[in-house]
Amino acid sequence: MKANGQASHKYLKALAGEMGADVSDLIALSYDNDPYYIGRPSHRELAEWFQGIWRQRGFEGRGGVHLRRVHQRRVHYQLLGAAKHDGRPYENITTDWNYLLKASRYARILGLVNPEDIIDRRNPEPHVYFYRPDDEQEKGFEPHIPGFDLPAPDTDLLSWLEENLKHPHLSPTGYDYDDFSQPYHVEVWVEKSTMNDILQPLCEELSTNLAVGVGYMTITSVVALLRRIEASGKPTRILYVSDFDKAGRNMPKAVARQTEFWSAMYAPDADIRLQPIVLTQDQIDKYDLPSLNIFDDGDEAPDDVVELDALEARVPGELASIVRENIERFRDKELSERFTQAKEGAQKMLDEQLAEHLADDIKRLDELKEEARPTIERYERLLEMLAARLERELEPLQVSLNEVRHAIEESVTALEPPLPDPPQPVATDPDDDGWLFDSSREYMDQLKHYKTPKQWQEMQAAMRSRHKVCAECGTSFVTTRKVRGRRYCDRNCRQRAHRRRQREYHQRKREAKKG
């Protein structure tokens, strides 16, 4: 399913009915946070309110390539005293600020406001090192044909002769290695900026984009990611780095879910996968990392938090090593050398082709150069005095050289050498089934990867228990969680069964009287 907004909400409701599932089974986040479920009346009320004030304040249409995008904090202060969707005044309090953020998010998810109209200052700009070069070249060649001009008066005419009557040559194009030639677009996403001193130089070295967030990544960050993916045109692998705590475990899922949702609009054909790589329980156990016990509101027991900083403090350099190892899984280490070899092979082929096609022209060029040499040697000594005479005597040769150059140009234009294709990157995509998010998966297959095996098995068992056979007509039907005791597929069958039982009851009474 690749649906947006209200269509997604309706789709999930219908799908839940068909499968005998509760809607909560078919979403990966909470009702108010999963973009595929946004579209309930309460969501739409807030979204339409935000759309109205967005238009009223003149903010619409500032996104995309425009520079004057709007930050929501500015909207907050402009709204003070204005009416909220329920008529109550908007105040300068945290509750109303969160109300605005929620309404803004719903409006963008439902397509009422362009996500790119809103600027994101909560998260810093990503460090982009992997991008398509502006001067990317296709396979081919560029001719280099000198002007073949004989010298005008100079003090060093023989050197001028050698320099300007060189043999023509061809240079292959499209064989220069660039990191953009690598097979994958890789990004490292990290929840906190305290690791920038480690990750930024590493990502720059490996031409890997680095996106740093403060807590949960925003819709703006995800849309910007999809813009980069669409521009690169390459399969994308997102490596997620976070603390190990309740929030850290949910953050990759939240980013994956937002990416899954918005990719339908911004990169529908993209191959995107996301996987948390740091911190994991195995890494915590391996390095014996200490945890902080933090109580969340309402928790009866503390939530164990292990910070990224603990890994770097206990095992200096290990974070960089883990990230480097994961990035290099998607890089072709021999690609640069193969580009060099391919360019050398193409150059050799061009040299051979040019020598074969221009043999007569080059021979004539050398003859003309030798014919010019004695004249130049003689007039070099008398240059100042005999400049005018030199020009007159060389004029016939210049005409001949122009003819040779014209002939060479025609021959080069007709060349169609069978140049080898530039090397294609080769990299194995490891652990094909182990990715938390894969854009090629269907909706239910992807949902399975968001659930734990136990959650998935429980959901399947619950759905099976809701599939019933009508006790009256024998038709299969699906009941809901609230009325699992239903025996009949619809009201008509229930009434028919009731009437049949009444007839049987009265029949038994009549038979009893006769007996």
Q: Which stretches of residues belong to each language-model region?
A:
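Nucleic-acid enzyme cleavage-core boundary/entry regions
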Residues: 1-236, 249-458
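Catalytic metal-binding/acid-base residues of hydrolase active sites
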Residues: 245
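BZIP DNA-binding basic region
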Residues: 461-515
